[in-house]
């Protein structure tokens, strides 16, 4: 699941945020 999430985020950062709003910390770490 982690890999799938990573790929999704890479394809659409915005979509990832909306898809997984429960883990905003992870997204911020990746953005950094």
From Swiss-Prot:
Any Gene Ontology CC annotation: extracellular region
Protein modification: Glycosylated.
InterPro entries assigned to the protein according to its UniProt record, in alphabetical order: Pentraxin-related (IPR001759)
GO biological process: acute-phase response
Primary location group: secreted
Origin: domain of life: Eukaryota
Keywords: Acute phase, Calcium, Secreted
Annotated compartments: Secreted
Keyword check for Transmembrane: no
Function: Displays several functions associated with host defense: it promotes agglutination, bacterial capsular swelling, phagocytosis, and complement fixation through its calcium-dependent binding to phosphorylcholine.
Subunit structure: Homopentamer. Pentraxin (or pentaxin) have a discoid arrangement of 5 non-covalently bound subunits.
Similarity comment: family membership: Belongs to the pentraxin family.
Protein name according to UniProt: C-reactive protein
Source species of the chain: Pleuronectes platessa
Taxonomic path: Eukaryota, Metazoa, Chordata, Craniata, Vertebrata
